[in-house]
């Protein structure tokens, strides 16, 4: 199947008509077609069968009817593709439109989301990915939450791993050692006795290590107050910061206009946990950090994440002020851990000053492909990126 797709890469692709595929399972043909909004219920059931968290109808409305990036296109882009056998969905890949900028150049981007295929039909699942990469009028293809197997598929379609250094390494601070270690024990599926004893001992060691090594933000920035607002309070001053950021050194940046920020972080099922920390000087917005908090339903781990952060000239003093505020916010809302994923080296260096712990993904979760070979080569330089959890679908489904 993969070889056949490679041969056909140069063939124009259009899915206004269904495509019939052959599967080794049974005799019924597999149909590949564009997803419809009316497929929501069937996609939800498919995700549940595949062990994935289902989406909400409200989030579908947000992603494919209220997305600011869709207003910039001259045609209606597919919301995704499905595999269908005798009227039953057996595969799905969502397709989310995004706007990016590289210097003064506007780019149309898409990111895959919610990839789900029943095991019996994995042999034809690559047709979903082929449809994604054969879209017309796209400058940049992104995959930002890939497990190892999905990463291999992305490489087969000539996507490359993100060259930004250490994106796959998460920096984190433990805020509540006991609750953190209890969540780890649950993930390891130990017996209640071992979990209790092991958790007590580990949390004691972890707490001691945190104090001895001073693993928390300690140095504030005098004269740089930080305030907290809701997503719906993101105003015109964010537009000024965004415009200034675009004039700095050329880097690939997802659209951070006020409308794009509000759309991204106003998640229907979020219940108001997304907050924005703002650092201002005499009313001038110097930078912001968006914080998302959630709880793992299996382990009980409460996590806060720096989902995005934008600061004038990447000023270390402003970054420190925002990170200290993020740490204090995470403690205040009862999170067990605060995480930082991604960001360029200069920003990670500021985070690392406070002796964070580190954990690494088993494989790179972020892949990209630019339609223009020259642009793709430009993006092979890690310095051209400003990749954060704001990119792709990393926090769109948080």
Please place each PLM-identified region on the residue numbering.
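Conserved N-terminal entry element of GNAT/NAT acetyltransferase domains
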Residues: 2, 7-38, 205-236
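Internal, well-ordered domain-core segments that constitute the primary functional module
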Residues: 97-171
């Amino acid at each position: 199947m993969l070889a056949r797709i490679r041969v056909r890469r140069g063939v124009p692709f259009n899915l206004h008509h269904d495509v019939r595929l052959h599967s080794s399972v049974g005799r019924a043909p597999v149909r590949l077609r564009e997803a419809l909004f009316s497929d929501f219920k069937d996609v939800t059931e498919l995700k549940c069968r595949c062990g994935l968290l289902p989406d909400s109808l409200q989030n579908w409305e947000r992603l494919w009817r209220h997305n600011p990036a869709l207003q910039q296109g001259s045609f209606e882009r597919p919301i995704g593709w499905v595999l269908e056998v005798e009227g039953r969905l057996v595969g799905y890949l969502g397709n989310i439109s995004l706007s990016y900028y590289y210097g003064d150049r506007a780019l149309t981007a898409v990111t895959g989301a919610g990839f789900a295929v029943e095991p019996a039909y994995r042999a034809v699942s690559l047709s979903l990915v082929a449809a994604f990469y054969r879209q017309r009028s796209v400058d940049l293809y992104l995959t930002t939450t890939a497990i190892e197997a999905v990463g291999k598929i992305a490489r087969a379609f000539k996507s490359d791993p993100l060259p930004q250094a250490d994106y796959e390494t998460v920096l984190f601070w433990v805020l509540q050692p006991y609750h953190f270690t209890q969540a780890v024990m649950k993930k390891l599926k130990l017996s209640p006795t071992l979990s209790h004893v092991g958790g007590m001992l580990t949390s004691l060691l972890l707490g001691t290590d945190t104090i001895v090594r001073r693993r928390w933000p300690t140095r504030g920035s005098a004269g740089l107050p930080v305030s907290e607002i809701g997503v719906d309070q993101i105003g015109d001053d964010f537009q000024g910061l965004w415009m200034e950021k675009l004039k700095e050194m050329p880097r690939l940046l997802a659209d951070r206009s006020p409308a794009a920020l509000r759309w991204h972080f106003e998640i229907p099922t979020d219940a108001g946990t997304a907050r924005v920390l703002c650092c201002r000087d005499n009313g001038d917005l110097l930078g912001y950090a968006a914080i998302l908090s959630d709880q793992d339903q299996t382990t009980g781990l409460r996590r806060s994440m720096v989902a995005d952060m934008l600061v004038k000239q990447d000023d270390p003093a402003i970054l420190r002020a925002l990170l200290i505020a993020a740490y204090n916010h995470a403690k205040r809302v009862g999170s067990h851990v605060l995480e930082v994923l991604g960001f360029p080296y200069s920003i990670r260096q500021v985070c690392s000053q406070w002796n964070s712990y580190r954990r690494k993904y088993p494989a790179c979760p972020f892949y990209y492909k630019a339609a223009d070979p020259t642009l793709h080569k430009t993006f092979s330089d890690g310095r051209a990126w400003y990749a954060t959890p704001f990119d792709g679908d990393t926090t769109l489904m948080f």
